[in-house]
Amino acid sequence: MANDENKQKALAAALGQIEKQFGKGSIMRLGENRSMDVETISTGSLSLDIALGAGGLPMGRIVEIYGPESSGKTTLTLQVIAAAQREGRTCAFIDAEHALDPVYAKKLGVDIDNLLCSQPDTGEQALEICDALSRSGAVDVIIVDSVAALTPKAEIEGEIGDSHMGLAARMMSQAMRKLAGNLKNSNTLLIFINQIRMKIGVMFGNPETTTGGNALKFYASVRLDIRRTGSVKNGDEVVGSETRVKVVKNKVAAPFKQAEFQILYGEGINTLGELIDLGVKHKMVEKAGAWYSYNGDKIGQGKANATIYLKEHPETAAELNKKLRDLLLHNTGDFSSAASDYVTDYEDNTEEVNNEEF
């Protein structure tokens, strides 16, 4: 017993010395004076928010979104920005690819007049800008598009064809060590968009890998794999893409959930269509034949007309969205069953979906 008391006194003295040297709060007991809830920002997709478990992307963390070309990576991040701006948050877009279309961003609901944008010349410059913005404590969301376009200064100044083995990986590794702590302190969400490459000589297993080395994989709290799985058609006209997102890593909730939704060209994620589907699944929206009803009132014949009704009555859509979020994100026990509404196994083939009721 005396030995235990001596240990407690020694521990208290050590904690006091640490706080005196490094400041109050530099060390604490995990359950003491802090919220265990993770603050999140919506992705713009209800089904993806459910699949993520915490209700969105976690603040103060690093997130990686990767996938093939034209799979919806930039669209998803622009939807995150739009959702954050609706909450009054400040966002920044680091356009390393020099390909951001402000007209398209505006169509997705982004307030381009209040969106900070940078088109850096080198990878080091892009990452220094990220660090400066996060240390300011005034920016809530930072998007980097993309890791593959973060070209080291030495490579830009060199000749085409010169070998620069491992330069990008070393640059990213150093940046991750520096950024991780600053992001946590400022509660800033940093999202990296990444591209896919093929590993040469892989006979077994997945030959796909992402650019920028392994540091980002380790430091990311959430990694999302986004794929286009088919086309959304209105008659013979292709009006969008069927999209599947898999949560391949998740440090704030259970990983390996999947979400499926539609991305409509010029409009973004079909959020109202998601509300209809989830509402029917959880018996908040009644479906009798082709007719959809909500609170006893018919809202449309066919999914397309029901979606139009919600678009014309935003207060009804907001009410249904709140009910679904309260039900499906009430506790962690609901995450698995809720995400399963949109869970399917990955398929290598890409289908065309003739969906006239988009």
Curated annotation (Swiss-Prot):
Gene Ontology biological process terms in this record: DNA recombination; DNA repair; SOS response
GO molecular function: ATP binding; ATP hydrolysis activity; ATP-dependent DNA damage sensor activity; damaged DNA binding; single-stranded DNA binding
Keyword entries, A-Z: ATP-binding, Cytoplasm, DNA damage, DNA recombination, DNA repair, DNA-binding, Nucleotide-binding, SOS response
Primary location: cytoplasm
GO CC, any one term: cytosol
SUPFAM superfamilies on file: P-loop containing nucleoside triphosphate hydrolases, RecA protein, C-terminal domain
Locations listed in the record: Cytoplasm
Protein family according to the UniProt entry: Belongs to the RecA family.
Stored PANTHER family: MITOCHONDRIAL DNA REPAIR PROTEIN RECA HOMOLOG-RELATED (PTHR45900:SF1), RECA (PTHR45900)
Function: Can catalyze the hydrolysis of ATP in the presence of single-stranded DNA, the ATP-dependent uptake of single-stranded DNA by duplex DNA, and the ATP-dependent hybridization of homologous single-stranded DNAs. It interacts with LexA causing its activation and leading to its autocatalytic cleavage.
Protein name: Protein RecA
Origin species: Xenorhabdus nematophila (strain ATCC 19061 / DSM 3370 / CCUG 14189 / LMG 1036 / NCIMB 9965 / AN6)
Gene giving rise to this polypeptide: recA
